[in-house]
Curated annotation (Swiss-Prot):
Keywords: ATP-binding, Cell inner membrane, Cell membrane, Cytochrome c-type biogenesis, Membrane, Nucleotide-binding, Translocase, Transport. Coiled coil: none annotated. This is Cytochrome c biogenesis ATP-binding export protein CcmA. PROSITE patterns: ABC_TRANSPORTER_1, ABC_TRANSPORTER_2, CCMA. It holds the Pfam family ABC_tran. GO terms for molecular function: ABC-type heme transporter activity; ATP binding; ATP hydrolysis activity.
Amino acid sequence: MHLTAENLAARRGEDMIFINISFYLAAGEALVLTGRNGSGKSTLLRVVAGLLKPEKGTVIFGDKESPEGQHPGEVSHYLGHRNAMKNELTVAENLDFWRHFLRSTCSSADLSVEDATEAVGLSGISHLPFGYLSAGQQRRFAFAKLLVAHRPVWILDEPTAALDASADRLFAGLIEAHLAKGGIVLAATHQPLGLKNAQELKMTGFAGVDRGVWG
């Protein structure tokens, strides 16, 4: 699997928020978007995830079987600012819904609901309504959605928001494990995710970006 973006541009209202953004990520690679609020990080993630149409440019999720690309929804997870979980349902019911909704085929990489809740360190409270939980607990369980239905590409917008230091480390470990298995990660963040050898794309607003390596 590879993720290729070529000459992307996007508009916010009447103004271009970024232009000419290109990058290539192969299996096992991560790109971290940094920059101030309003610099276009979330917009770029939504464009790559297929949720916003770019002003110009292309995004390709390709592999040997589909060199011309697959639909983002078939091969990627998008975790935005909102957790996309029903407050009235229990954690287990929410995850079971997403497990069945997202799985087009059964994969050996899919975790059970029980294993996913254990992976995010909250196996003992999955019987509780989602709305009963703290913001940090809710964010952990939102991340568990990525584990119950495998997708090779993770697109993450501030994935560690509302988390404490121990949860930050736990999430970094889960992301590193995904990369080690050949996954791809594109993430926007205001703080380091602790990823080894991650590339950085610093967004500064209209047209301005810098490239580097950031851990």
